Structure formats: structure tokens, C-alpha cells
Amino acid sequence: MASLITTHRVKASIFASCLAIGLLLTLFVSSASSWRQAITPAGLRLEQATQAIVVSEPLHCPKNKTQPTVNPGGSHLAYVTWLSGTVDQTDDLENDKYFVATRILLWHLLHNPSTRTQGIDVVVMVDPSVSEARRARLVRDGAILHAVEFLTSSVALHPEQERWKNIMTKLRVFQMTQYSRILMLDGDTMLLHPLDGVFDDPGAQIQHTQDHEPTTLAALPPTYLLAGISEPADSHHSFPVTKAEIKDPGYLNAGFFMLAPSEAAFEHYRSYLQVPGTFRSTYMEQDLLNQAHRWDGPMPWKELDYKWNVRYPTENDFEKGLVSMHEKWWEQKYIYDNQKVKDWLQSRRWEMKGWYDAYDRMNCDA
């Protein structure tokens, strides 16, 4: 594959630098020939799927933003993902799988022409455990960085995995009241198509809290928004996933959900961390949100269209119009068969790297 960077309206010096980027990309794509020839589940060859790394338009250094973007209708919308310290806290960022996954998500949302947003802010919420090197890399990648303090609990919590010990901090997204609505995404999310349309989903609208009995917890907010999807048991499912295929009906997966920030909602959630026995904590913030927004309670969560996201994606999902998936690029325990999907997931890691290698050549800090 060759990459040719042309423009008729830029100065010769800019043309020269873009040409250098193109040469770098040519070398990268040549080295990727071992996976480039595979057929993707969407019926495209990977050389077509990797078109984002063939720079057909000028790359621009990111500008640090201090104010939220005003979206159509005067609203302030955002994509937010949360990053905490992983097991590996060295500055070998290329081998930190969860950090790499976050960078892939940013690349999908900000830079890939086939998946990027049209003007919605992309924010990474970081807690104190995230190193300065990681923070600097995320800003260079184009993310808005939002630093928060840990959210602690006065009751004992029993997460299934040790690496989830700080994950209650993720609930601080509800304090980001500079935005009217937020799509919260786990870092191991990948996109096939743009996600902007999810903000128009019927389920993604603010609701009124229903009448309810007095509670020992903090007061419920008068309005709220929590909308998302449940997950299938594995990759043996239809597209879209049917109710009969859902592993735990009525149980929201907190890796992909829409919310309306609210200090009142945040204080209500935080009160669960101060009263023993109010929720199970195996899946931490996911269990807390499901208890607060249970379907038989005063703030039931709403379902989004299942085309927007799925766990354990399949070739059929790709072909039928799946928009995004919640799946690790390096490990897919519950995707059975569907080797093309697994190949596609792994290829995103290297496509992202090729794009950013060219991006870094621009010397944005100079």
C-alpha cells in the first residue's frame, strides 16, 4: 500500500512535512502485510479498513480546551472514559494494555475518518494513580483531561477483581455538570461507525423520578438519566441481541451508558457507600447503579437500541450494522469462532500506532 499526501492550497513547507509523514506510513503499512490481506467481518479487506492511516488530509496538532463545546440546540455533550492506574505503572506505555486500549478509543472518537465524532468533546477522567507520562500522552492524542480525586467508601467493598478497587471513582462523572449529557465508555470500547447518533436515541433522554417511599439514603434527584444495554452470555447471539439472549435481564452493563450529570444524583449514589448492606459490590459501581436504577424502583434505567454496542461481537454483528463493541483488543474469552472479528480487534492496535507514529512526527511541542 502506498500513501500519497497531496494538497493544492498549502505552502510548500507544509507539503514537504506531509510527504514525510506519508513515507513513514508506507513503511508501517508494508510491515503490516501479515494481517493486511485478511477479510474483515464487514466484507472489507483490511487494506481498506486501514485507510485511516493513509493520510489523505492534513494532520493538526491538538489544542487544549478549557470550555465545553456547545453542540446543536445549545447542549453540551461529551464522550467520557475513566482511566486509573493499571498493574504496570512503569513508563513503558506501549506494553500497558489498558492504556493502549484507551488510546485506541480516543483514536476512534477523534481521528479515524470512519468513526470520529462531529464536534462532541472527548474526555478522559483520570485519578491520582495515573502517571504524568500517561496524562501527557493522552493530551497529545487530543483528549480533554479531567482530573478527579478517589471516591472512597466507609463500608467494606468486595470487588471480584483487585484491579477494580478504585472503580467507584468512575461515579464522579456525575459531577461533570459542565455537560448536559454524557456517554460513558469503558476504555476497551472500539467503534465501527460514528456514535454521535446515540444522543438522539429515545432512551437517552432525561426522565422524571417517580413517587417513592422515604429512604435512609440521600434524597433522590427530581430528574435523572441512566440508559444503556444489558449483555448476552457470549458470542452466540443475534443482531440486535434479543431479550431471550440477554444473560441477566434488567441488569445494565456499566461499560456503556448515557447519563445526565447531577450533584444530587452523585450525592445519592455516594450515600450507598456510607450505609452498609444497601447493594452488593461484586461488580462495584455497576452493582450500585443497578440497585439505584432497578426497574422496579423510582428511577428505572432505560434501554438504548442494541445496535449501539455489544459484548462478544460476531461477524454477523459487523455485517448487520453494529456501531461499537465492548471488547478487549488483546483477549476475547467469550467470542467463539469468529476469527475475523478477533483479527480485526488486534489490527486496531497497530492501525492506531501507525497513525500516531505519523502524528508524532509533526513535532507538536516545537
Q: For the regions a protein language model found, what residue spans apply to each?
A:
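Glycosyltransferase catalytic domains, chiefly GT-A lineage
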Residues: 2-366
